Amino acid sequence: MRGSGRASSAITIVNAFATGKGAAIGIELWTEARVRVTGDGEVRGKIVVKGEEFKDYRLVNSVISVLREVTGEPFGVRFEIHSDIPVGKGLKSSSAAANSLTKALVEALRLNIDDLSIVKLGVEAAKRAGVTITGAFDDACASYFGGLCITDNYEMEILVKREINPETVVLLIPRETVLTESLKGVDFSKISPFIGEALRLAISGEWKKALVINGLLYSTFLGYDLAPMREALKLGAFVGLCGKGPAFFAIADEPEEIIEAWSSFGDVIATSLR
């Protein structure tokens, strides 16, 4: 039995680290998973990220473990995952991988599971794999459904779900990598009152203001160089931090100006909201 699944990257509007509630918007960078379920109990396959093989299989094994519990069957899997989403940059690569693989397995196993439950299974797998701090339910929803998703990550409840115009978004991908597990134990409580204000802005519809406040707060707190944000703000852009970083993103009337201004800071990708 075969199945396939597809899920996207997303940008952070409000990071849930400080309050447990977060907001994200899907963007047009994709991860695709193809699977074949077997009866031999073996798991074999490959992950290819931006043309290079990726050999961390923790999340794959966690997704399979969760689905084995759902079915009660020790099925085997042959899998292929191909992704355009850089890993360790804050661009929701784990959420996209969990969503796409879970969706593919649900299809292959012919399970009658709705979309939101698929997302929640992927979040559970991500928690078990240790690739998320809060569960990243906001990221997972934006990755799966697209649009603006505002969620309570601890309760796994969607607070707001709204369609978004497909504006151009410019991504700055620095060379360094920051894995989410490296931030376990960091106390974000000191910035939670301010992040709470950003969340209220996002809920009220002013998500562009929210992403700037969120980006400035988390970038400062985590010690990132603010030069990319400063350059984008000078050009009138709405600029934020992708997850825990180090990637930044900007939404501007003249995206070409942002691309030029950011070219000296790292790799730059232009895509769109979805």
From Swiss-Prot:
Pathway entry: Metabolic intermediate biosynthesis; chorismate biosynthesis; chorismate from D-erythrose 4-phosphate and phosphoenolpyruvate: step 5/7
Highest taxon, organism lineage: Archaea
SUPFAM superfamilies: Ribosomal protein S5 domain 2-like
UniProt record similarity statement: Belongs to the GHMP kinase family. Archaeal shikimate kinase subfamily.
Catalytic activity, reaction form: shikimate + ATP = 3-phosphoshikimate + ADP + H(+)
Entry keyword annotation includes Kinase: yes
Keyword annotations from UniProtKB, A to Z: Amino-acid biosynthesis, Aromatic amino acid biosynthesis, ATP-binding, Cytoplasm, Kinase, Nucleotide-binding, Transferase
Any one cellular-component term (Gene Ontology): cytoplasm
Name assigned to this protein: Shikimate kinase
Gene3D superfamilies noted in UniProt: 3.30.230.10
